[in-house]
Amino acid sequence: MRLNIAPAPWPGAPVVVLSAGLGGGGGYWLAQRAALEEQYQLVSYDHNGTGENAGPLPAGYSLATMAGELFSALQAAGIARFALVGHALGALIGLQLALDRPEAVSALALVNGWLSLSPHTRRCFQVRERLLHAGGAQAWVEAQPLFLYPAEWMAARLPRLEAEDALAISHFQGKENLLKRLQALKQADFSRRASAIACPTLIISAADDLLVPASCSRVLQTAIPGSQLVEMPWGGHACNVTDADTFNTILRDGLSAMLPVARETR
């Protein structure tokens, strides 16, 4: 699996891995890069089955497989220890890694994640799957912003959304890959194991998230010992895109508290 590894801002700078949601694209974190790259060595990647790592996924594809793929790629690149910032599915990958490879994960920042899929989120995905089966990639892509962004934000950016739709359709990961990745997401359940997560953990949510209710992050914070929760009042599921300034401040402050070496080394 190909990783995009930025230069370290100085020797020994902490490594921060950025993991996207179901879309899988490393470009999802574009609005965060400038806010983080002066303090951390950033690693982004397209999830297997998407983008630069396109290709058919095996039967029985699971969250543990996703986490194992990322860990193996990081090891091959000589990265033994890292913090992970994950959005939705990316947050689940972070949880899996923190449990499977606790020696490697220095900290987690979990954005609009969950312990187990809520009935509301399951309903949303059922609707989206029906759209995929009935209308293919175009229907899936055109519906996606409704679950990601607040209405007023979308209404003010129609040309941008149309351009993003066209790009997403042209680079669509494929129906079979999407369904396998979605199935892995739906089956993930950390409700019995989250208490074993020992690394510092920041949880960020948005109060108006249509896809993943903010209450899921509150439950997650209760389950992970010592974790901290910051709830943004606005921004939707993709709050790191719609209100990047607020999100970046929260993330920078959280990473600085969890990874103090980033301050002391300078």
Swiss-Prot record:
Keywords: Hydrolase
Database matches in InterPro entries: AB_hydrolase, AB_hydrolase_1, AB_hydrolase_fold, Pyrimidine_utilisation_RutD
Annotated catalysed reactions: carbamate + 2 H(+) = NH4(+) + CO2
Presence of keyword GTP-binding: no
EC number per UniProt: 3.5.1.-
GO MF, any single term: hydrolase activity, acting on carbon-nitrogen (but not peptide) bonds, in linear amides
Role this protein plays: Involved in pyrimidine catabolism. May facilitate the hydrolysis of carbamate, a reaction that can also occur spontaneously.
Protein name, per record: Putative carbamate hydrolase RutD
Organism name: Klebsiella pneumoniae subsp. pneumoniae (strain ATCC 700721 / MGH 78578)
